[in-house]
Amino acid sequence: MKRDFDEISEEEWSQHSFNASRVLKRPRTPKKTRAATNPTPSIESFAFRRPSTAMTIESNSSDGDCVEIEDLGDSDSDVKIVNGEDLLLEDEEEVEETKVVMRAARVGRRFVIEDEEASDDDDDEAESSASEDEFGGGGGGSGGRRGEDEDVVGKALQKCAKISADLRKELYGTSSGVTDRYSEVETSTVRIVTQNDIDDACKAEDSDFQPILKPYQLVGVNFLLLLYKKGIEGAILADEMGLGKTIQAITYLTLLSRLNNDPGPHLVVCPASVLENWERELRKWCPSFTVLQYHGAARAAYSRELNSLSKAGKPPPFNVLLVCYSLFERHSEQQKDDRKVLKRWRWSCVLMDEAHALKDKNSYRWKNLMSVARNANQRLMLTGTPLQNDLHELWSLLEFMLPDIFTTENVDLKKLLNAEDTELITRMKSILGPFILRRLKSDVMQQLVPKIQRVEYVLMERKQEDAYKEAIEEYRAASQARLVKLSSKSLNSLAKALPKRQISNYFTQFRKIANHPLLIRRIYSDEDVIRIARKLHPIGAFGFECSLDRVIEEVKGFNDFRIHQLLFQYGVNDTKGTLSDKHVMLSAKCRTLAELLPSMKKSGHRVLIFSQWTSMLDILEWTLDVIGVTYRRLDGSTQVTDRQTIVDTFNNDKSIFACLLSTRAGGQGLNLTGADTVIIHDMDFNPQIDRQAEDRCHRIGQTKPVTIFRLVTKSTVDENIYEIAKRKLVLDAAVLESGVHVDDNGDTPEKTMGEILASLLMG
């Protein structure tokens, strides 16, 4: 049964049968009486205006997907709608003679998509890379490619340019000097809502919470409301990390209900680590909303109930559904069933937090999520790092945001989107301005505490240096056999001769030693391993069904620290025995921490320590125990339900000095303003990952200056990684801020590691 949104009574909303414990029921504020007929939101500014008198352009197409606007001079009172195809797809000279077409903001909507549109076979098609009908271009509709592959980028930007020009007029009026940056905070003239409107929409009668937005956040909300008013189906809120994108997005959803009679349903997709925070902020800023967190053990029961409701044509029992990205990554039957349920709902807004997770349009995550989001009224992406490595990744976000414009089907964008093309970078930046709101802390928060960057170059301890040199000699010898087969012994030849897996293994070993020598096996010899394995085998350390030979093989693959843990765990007495506290200080970085942390604690600072390796976090726990400071830990293995508790405990309990976090799990979305110091123990090739980690404490609510320490072990691959990371940040600044030319060959990590290894092993 198909019903318009306004046909659903408040009584039906309150009498649904869904009583899951995670649903937050709030009394709904009375809606204002809606006009009998809602006029279509004004989109006349998108029509091409001729200087001549009224003129009608007819079309023979029967495609009713889009509508054309007939311009009647400068009058806004008479707008004629005729059926036709999207004339933006014509060549540029023909576009100049026609009208710009935009899809109007949808007012009347259906809750449920017909079963024919979301059949049980859809998800199987989504899992197939050959299913271009399911994903190809992400529901590109009538805006397919025209011309040769090399023209696809220009065609997409040409279609986008007309819309961009009119949006720019709305944002900036006749102001000049704003065309070379993304949407600015001071220059925007849009005033759809004020702080008083925010107070009315977000204030709950039984709460003393004051929903105050900062001025730039109010601009962000108005920006999103303008795009909704104009029927723009996608946007990227790309404010720098720590500027409150979550609050702006949540306030926007509240205002859609208050001002546009659109209470959802909305789908919010985010990393697992911030699910609890999203639910908490939704409760605070959207007191009239019902929120369901679709995650955890009870998800299967929710799935069955939601499936039943959607098939019956009933309205959803929530305003906002919170899900994790993992729901779109895995291929179990449960995940497939979940995605089928989501595809049956007609979403108003699909909101993606940390949307740079969608940088690869060929990934299952991108394709599966697009199969759900393609029918939504709007796709809103939140990311503080819209450009991480190259223009191809940015284009993937744009295609997800506005698939009708940016669909590229099977075109190899990596060949077309060259970072050396200065003209393309400048053109993209100018055209995309009105669709991407990007503010930096330096632009909008001069009062924000400063962030001080420090690089600590540390010298290897003697035994650490010996281990590093031994590894060089070992891998150099192993590479000689391959070099003999080459006619040229150049650096490039060595890089090409080594298989990718071997390059990765060698490079990882060098990184481990640079971090801590206990991450390799050097203390426990093969004889020690055999003796230890014979003691572990009878007590079933690896299972009683495991043979002695298999135990020996397994332990030989362990590093020194892991063997130490085994001996400690099972209380095995051996000649070598467990390691002592002095072994934890065999690393230059741990020795540096032992010098820095006590003085930081004495000065009243609190610290976040990030590492990419959970095994390194284990060693860092040992290090902090030896130093004698209190800490908490959060990594990928931490239960989702426990993460927010750890964050709250650290922020509120000042007796806890440090928090250990894995860079990937702990570097996204968390608010850890209880700390004022960040230590990046080991850097990522992608500098944006480390920047996300930095901004866990350098964000709104921080009252102390923030200091960032990067630990770099001298004369190791650490220095190479640091230099590469600095170069990659240039491209982000080029496209998102200044538009200057950059030289980036788009090398893969494997190629980069190969070149570093070649230089190291041939040195």
Curated annotation (Swiss-Prot):
Main location: nucleus
Enzyme category, top tier: hydrolase
Induction (free text): By UV-C illumination. Accumulates in response to the mutagens rose Bengal (RB) and methyl methane sulfonate (MMS).
Compositionally skewed regions (Acidic residues) per UniProt: 114-135
Residue intervals of the Helicase C-terminal domain: 592-742
Organism domain of life: Eukaryota
KW Transmembrane helix (keyword) present: no
Location in or out of the cell: Nucleus
Binding site for ATP: D239, E240, M241, G242, L243, G244, K245, T246
EC number(s) stated in the UniProt entry for this protein: 3.6.4.-
Any one Gene Ontology molecular-function term assigned to this protein's record: hydrolase activity
Keywords on record: ATP-binding, Chromatin regulator, Coiled coil, DNA damage, DNA repair, DNA-binding, Helicase, Hydrolase, Nucleotide-binding, Nucleus, RNA-mediated gene silencing, Transcription, Transcription regulation
Listed GO CC annotations: nucleus
Family, per entry: Belongs to the SNF2/RAD54 helicase family.
Subunit-structure text: Interacts with SUVR2 and itself.
Function: DNA helicase that possesses intrinsic ATP-dependent nucleosome-remodeling activity and is both required for DNA repair and heterochromatin organization. Promotes DNA end resection of double-strand breaks (DSBs) following DNA damage: probably acts by weakening histone DNA interactions in nucleosomes flanking DSBs. Probable chromatin remodeling factor. Probable helicase-like transcription factor involved in transcriptional gene silencing.
Other facts: Induction by the mutagens rose Bengal (RB) and methyl methane sulfonate (MMS) is enhanced in progeny of Chernobyl plants exposed to ionizing radiation thus leading to a higher resistance to DNA damages.
Protein name (record): Protein CHROMATIN REMODELING 19
